[in-house]
């Protein structure tokens, strides 16, 4: 376990600093603080953070859920980063590198960085670990937290399970100790750092496809087939990158995929529903009102599949709908019209 350290601006031991005060970052911070730990929640908009402190709640994203007393609201990045050895970065994937670069000058010698961001680097499709290495080098321990979690349910204290992976086994053990709550939040250790990062990105894309299928009106049979074949595409890409096959049958693979494809709490699924009902991309995004990670993830995953030479027909058709203006019904027809294949291919 990490030793207590009260030598910071707050005069108390800070178990973790959460970077990102959106719905998921806030819910993770709430869950950590409910374990009795002192937790900092940092956000980049001072006015928003002032509202959170005044209300002691995030009414915009998590209405009706009060903050624990041990949750500290902060808009000063230097103070937040310096206060805790362990950072949990929870920001959209397209700003992950920007935020990490902002944190870099304030990192401690013993800092360890975990992220719950799901996605790849914009325009390149690189894994976030590669982005992190480019920015901060290889002297810091890195970890990824991923699995089937809706922010509201987590913040409400409803039962949830998730996985954490890192090349540093001691960091994994510490994260399990800090995050795990035997009553509501179970944290599994995983040693597949690559697969854990990939699952969260690909499932967002497949969830858009599941929503499109339902929006068109294809029903449960088609949705289930799409989820199953989407899992096959995820596994093929993972194999090409050196991931472990069993990872995609776990929390960060099948678990997150099923959750995101079948429940309308998922923005990616709702985005796909709107597209399937004939709405254009801009209108569909406006209806959601929050970041739809799967929109950017689709381009990132498509680029990665092209670079690795991995066939991903579902991802390819969703990419054509989002970025080339293809009609969702035509995309579905083209998927069904593909040459006959063995299921394992």
UniProtKB/Swiss-Prot annotation:
It comes from the Bacteria. GO terms for cellular component: cytosol. It catalyses: sn-glycerol 3-phosphate + NAD(+) = dihydroxyacetone phosphate + NADH + H(+); sn-glycerol 3-phosphate + NADP(+) = dihydroxyacetone phosphate + NADPH + H(+). NADPH binds at residues 23-24, 44, 118, 151, 267, 291, 293. Pathway: Membrane lipid metabolism; glycerophospholipid metabolism. The active site is at residue 203. It is found in: Cytoplasm. One of its GO terms (molecular function) is NAD binding. Pfam families: NAD_Gly3P_dh_C, NAD_Gly3P_dh_N. Sn-glycerol 3-phosphate binds at residues 118, 147, 149, 203, 256, 266-268. Keywords: Cytoplasm, Lipid biosynthesis, Lipid metabolism, NAD, NADP, Nucleotide-binding, Oxidoreductase, Phospholipid biosynthesis, Phospholipid metabolism. GO terms for biological process: carbohydrate metabolic process; glycerol-3-phosphate biosynthetic process; glycerol-3-phosphate catabolic process; glycerophospholipid biosynthetic process. Its EC number is 1.1.1.94. It is an enzyme of class 1 (oxidoreductase). Belongs to the NAD-dependent glycerol-3-phosphate dehydrogenase family. Catalyzes the reduction of the glycolytic intermediate dihydroxyacetone phosphate (DHAP) to sn-glycerol 3-phosphate (G3P), the key precursor for phospholipid synthesis. This is Glycerol-3-phosphate dehydrogenase [NAD(P)+]. It comes from Vibrio campbellii (strain ATCC BAA-1116).
